[in-house]
């Protein structure tokens, strides 16, 4: 029997943005544990805004497990939060509301800033660095510094070793801003892996004395890009059949549900979706071929192939709850 370090990970009830929590327990197994072998576990919900002190117990229900490459005999256990009966989903548990669909494919582009001492990494103590332009996909110390690339490369390796379907990294438009991409076949798979990848990034930066800032517009009303979580999506029908009529009907449905979508695409999105910095205004729906200033970007390949394929919803922001985004798509 081997002692395994099980890191149980969940989303708390902090508002307006649910943050990730984690705690470790040790259990013995003959081999790396399967999901079915992982026990339920309790936690103090009064300290995560998920319960009151007089009835503080909440339950963690494992829903997926990955190897933890950072720890010897470690496991990363993504969990849903349940009520004390272990059967009723907690009100903050948005994952439980998602019907899994193996034909639904999602690719999330998670943007974020590195912060140190309250400012984006690479910014001077006062004022701003040179304007945007050289930083996107940039190389060289003056564009990306030294420690940022070290972190994103290490995060990439950790995710791949954990079995997360991490598809790539790049420096983003603003200095100190980066992106990673996660793809999943199946609604819940993609969202689970985004959450675990976020957790791994935040945990990794601890040893560098650096924070990860997921707010969508941390630099406010300035000439610096905000952070999104663009969602590339398709269904089996959209990939295999599609067609212009179906596409136009789909866009009409998206326009009709504009405000419902914006409500779950992350807090403070009005600060980011201004019509500037590669965004569409938050209160207007639009789509266009290769248009990064539209709500929905339509790839050239989609039109050239007679309208089967995938689409990109550019409105979701970097603090978006991926489970709620699945419900809106």
From Swiss-Prot:
Protein residues bound to Mg(2+): 109, 111, 172, 179
Chief place of localization: cytoplasm
Cross-referenced SMART domains: Gln-synt_C
Keyword Disulfide bond listed: no
Record key words, sorted: ATP-binding, Cytoplasm, Ligase, Magnesium, Metal-binding, Nitrogen fixation, Nucleotide-binding, Plasmid
Stretches assigned to the GS beta-grasp domain: 4-86
Binding site for L-glutamate: 278
Chain positions recorded as ATP binding sites: 167
Residue ranges of every copy of the GS catalytic domain listed in the record: 89-329
EC numbers on record: 6.3.1.2
Catalytic activity: L-glutamate + NH4(+) + ATP = L-glutamine + ADP + phosphate + H(+)
GO molecular function annotations of the record: ATP binding; glutamine synthetase activity; metal ion binding
Enzyme class: ligase
Keyword Ligase: yes
GO biological process: glutamine biosynthetic process; nitrogen fixation
Highest taxon in the source lineage: Bacteria
PANTHER family with a match to the protein in the record: GLUTAMINE SYNTHETASE, GLUTAMINE SYNTHETASE 2 CYTOPLASMIC
Quaternary structure and interacting proteins, as annotated: Homooctamer and homotetramer.
Family: Belongs to the glutamine synthetase family.
Protein name: Glutamine synthetase
Organism expressing this protein natively: Rhizobium meliloti (Ensifer meliloti)
